[in-house]
C-alpha cells in the first residue's frame, strides 16, 4: 500500500531499554492530542515494548502525570 494512512515512524526506544512511567516527555510521544495511546502499527514498537508502554501510560495517568483525556483536543 504505497498511499498508506498510517506512516510507520522509527521508535525512539531501543529494544531492551526500560519504559518508565515517570518519563512524561517520552510517553507524550506515544499518545494523541486527545490522550489516546497510539497503536503499535503507528509507533513501530515491538509487542513487548507496546505492552510496557501501555502499562507505563496507565500508571502515569493514575498518579496524575498524564491526563486521562485532553479537553482541548
Swiss-Prot record:
The keyword Ribosomal protein applies. PROSITE patterns: RIBOSOMAL_S18. GO terms for molecular function: small ribosomal subunit rRNA binding; structural constituent of ribosome. Pfam families: Ribosomal_S18. Keywords: Ribonucleoprotein, Ribosomal protein, RNA-binding, rRNA-binding. Binds as a heterodimer with protein bS6 to the central domain of the 16S rRNA, where it helps stabilize the platform of the 30S subunit. Part of the 30S ribosomal subunit. Forms a tight heterodimer with protein bS6. NCBIfam families: S18. Belongs to the bacterial ribosomal protein bS18 family. This is Small ribosomal subunit protein bS18.
